C-alpha cells in the first residue's frame, strides 16, 4: 500500500489523509455492495473514528482482517469490478502506523473488538452481546513520531467526502455533525464546479462500469475530474486520455458529415 508523503496535514496528499481514506474505503465498499447507507466520521485533535453500518466483519475474522496480511474478504465478481482494494492491506497499514488502533465489529447482536499499538495487540476483548446495529467501528490515532505535529484540516476532508457522495449517490456521510449527501451523483459535482451557466443541459451517461457527465460553458480552458474504482485520479491516466480523444473524434466526425 502507498501512504504517500508523511507530512503534517498541511497538504491534501499527506499520509494522515491516506490513513483516513483507507478506513473509509472499506465502509464505501460495504455501501457499494448494498449494505449500510450512512457512515459517521468524528475527528478531534488527535483521533479519528469511522463507523459504518454495513454487515460487520465476521466476528472470528476481526483479528485477521485488522492485523494479518492477505486476509481481505472482497473476492466476488462484483467486488472485483467495484472495490477499491481487495487484499485488505490498507486497514493493516493504518494499524501499524497508529499508536492506538481500536476496531469493533457488530454483527447479528454480538460484537468483537481489539485494541492495538503500532500493529501489536494490546487487548483482545472477548466476544459479547450488543444492541448496536450491524457494522464496523474503527478508531485510530496516527503515530506522531511518524506524522510529526500532524493536524487534520477540515477543508481537505470535506473535499474528499464530497467526491465519495458524488460517486455514490444516496450515501450519507456525517463528518463532525456536518451532513454530506448527493441525490444526482456526478451531475451534482459538475453543477458545483461550474463557474458559469452551461451552454446546454448537462449530458449524463451511466452504464454498469462507467459514468460520464459533460457540458460546456462560455469560457476558455477545460476542466476534468476523473475517477477510477472510486478514487480521484488527480494526474489523469489512460482512461481520461481515451475519453478526451473519443469525445474530440466524435464531434469532428459529426461535423464532417453531410446531414439533411
Language-model features, listed with the residues they occupy:
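GHKL-type ATPase core
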Residues: 49, 53, 60-61, 73-194
Amino acid at each position: 500500500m502507498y501512504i504517500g508523503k508523511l507530512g503534517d496535514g498541511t497538504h491534501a496528499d499527506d499520509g494522515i489523509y491516506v490513513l483516513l481514506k483507507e478506513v473509509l474505503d472499506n465502509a464505501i465498499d460495504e455501501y457499494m455492495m448494498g449494505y449500510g447507507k450512512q457512515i459517521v466520521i468524528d475527528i478531534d485533535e488527535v483521533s479519528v473514528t469511522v463507523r459504518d453500518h454495513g454487515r460487520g466483519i465476521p466476528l472470528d475474522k476481526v483479528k485477521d482482517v485488522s492485523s494479518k496480511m492477505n486476509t481481505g474478504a472482497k473476492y466476488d465478481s462484483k467486488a472485483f469490478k467495484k472495490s477499491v482494494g481487495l487484499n485488505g492491506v490498507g486497514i493493516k497499514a493504518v494499524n501499524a502506523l497508529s499508536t492506538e488502533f481500536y476496531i469493533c465489529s457488530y454483527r447479528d447482536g454480538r460484537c468483537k473488538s481489539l485494541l492495538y499499538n503500532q500493529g501489536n495487540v494490546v487487548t483482545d476483548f472477548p466476544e459479547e452481546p450488543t444492541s448496536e446495529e450491524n457494522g464496523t467501528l474503527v478508531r485510530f490515532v496516527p503515530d506522531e513520531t511518524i506524522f510529526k505535529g500532524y493536524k487534520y484540516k477540515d477543508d481537505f476532508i470535506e473535499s474528499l467526502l464530497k467526491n465519495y457522495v458524488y460517486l455514490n449517490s444516496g450515501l450519507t456521510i456525517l463528518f463532525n455533525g456536518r451532513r454530506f449527501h448527493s441525490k444526482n451523483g456526478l451531475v451534482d459535482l459538475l453543477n458545483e464546479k461550474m463557474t458559469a451557466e452551461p451552454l446546454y443541459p448537462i449530458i449524463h451517461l451511466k452504464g454498469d462500469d462507467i459514468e460520464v457527465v459533460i457540458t460546456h460553458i462560455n469560457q476558455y480552458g477545460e476542466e476534468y475530474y476523473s475517477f477510477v474504482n472510486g478514487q480521484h485520479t488527480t494526474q489523469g491516466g489512460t482512461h481520461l486520455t481515451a475519453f478526451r480523444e473519443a469525445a474530440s473524434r466524435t464531434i469532428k466526425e459529426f461535423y464532417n458529415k453531410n446531414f439533411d
